[in-house]
Amino acid sequence: MTTALDQLKQYTTVVADTGDFQQLAQYKPQDATTNPSLVLKAVQKDEYKPLLEKTVRDHASKPVGSIIDNLLIAFGTEILKIVPGRVSTEVDARLSFDTKASIDKAHELIKMYDAQGIGRERVLIKLASTWEGIRAAEVLQKDGIKCNMTLLFSLAQAVAAAEAGAQLISPFVGRIYDWYKKNAGSNWDEARDGGANDPGVQSVRRIYAYYKKFGYPTEVMGASFRTTSQILELAGCDLLTISPDLLQKLHDSNDRIERKLSPEASRNADIERVPTDEASFRFLVNDDAMATEKLSEGIRVFAADAIKLEKVIEALR
């Protein structure tokens, strides 16, 4: 019997969302994604202490920010020994509103990968989907550096990223679901509001349909899943990045998977073009309470975890 994970791979490129690279091989993902929170979680495990300690030791004379960059590269390098495709490495969230600093940091990260013998075609630079982050991606893409736009919660962000020529976007399914469930309170009905009606699932479907209808080549990678149901409702999406625990659940399941998204079905979608000038972008994101709150919260969380990672490193110096 074919596993649900293997069936999903027939329709969608499966990506592993983890810094715990020792778990990767068993699921055979094509790509992998990381972020400061995942790396922070990984370095707290005993099996990654040697990599952390070696990185700190080898770069002890450098500023702590540089050591973090080297740690991200060390994790990315190990991941690329396992996955045949690409790894996503994130620019410090504290640069989310600084276009030039984001561009400079992306070039630094690519240069560091190059020093490890890893070509830029195997790396995606993750940037927050702020106006400034999207502008950074526009420049970087023209420089041949491929970008993964993260912390994406709205169609306005997705369209602006595609217009900027971003290689890939990561709309956050689970965090959208969390927001609507929390705000609904006792009115939330999982049977009614989950599954195909899940607000996070619907958001990704809308973005996917928009891209396919209007011919954008930017890849759509659903991210931030809470359940296997959310994943299976997006079977057929270009890519899905999935945590090891949910990959395991899919691996253990033999349920039959059906394709839910396809370019052909999306071309006739009832959807209008979205303006992408700065004023329209800022208004549309501001007008979406969920997108506004989750974007700002996401930046705060990633920034806080970067600071925690700095403290872990400082304690070893």
UniProtKB/Swiss-Prot annotation:
It holds the Pfam family TAL_FSA. Its EC number is 2.2.1.2. One of its GO terms (molecular function) is transaldolase activity. It comes from the Bacteria. Keywords: Cytoplasm, Pentose shunt, Schiff base, Transferase. Signal peptide: none annotated. One of its GO terms (biological process) is carbohydrate metabolic process. GO terms for cellular component: cytoplasm. It catalyses: D-sedoheptulose 7-phosphate + D-glyceraldehyde 3-phosphate = D-erythrose 4-phosphate + beta-D-fructose 6-phosphate. InterPro entries: Aldolase_TIM, TAL/FSA, Transaldolase_1, Transaldolase_AS. Gene3D superfamilies: Aldolase class I. It is found in: Cytoplasm. Pathway: Carbohydrate degradation; pentose phosphate pathway; D-glyceraldehyde 3-phosphate and beta-D-fructose 6-phosphate from D-ribose 5-phosphate and D-xylulose 5-phosphate (non-oxidative stage): step 2/3. The active site is at 126 (schiff-base intermediate with substrate). Transmembrane segments: none annotated. Homodimer. Transaldolase is important for the balance of metabolites in the pentose-phosphate pathway. PANTHER family: TRANSALDOLASE. Belongs to the transaldolase family. Type 1 subfamily. This is Transaldolase. It comes from Paraburkholderia phymatum (strain DSM 17167 / CIP 108236 / LMG 21445 / STM815). The gene is tal.
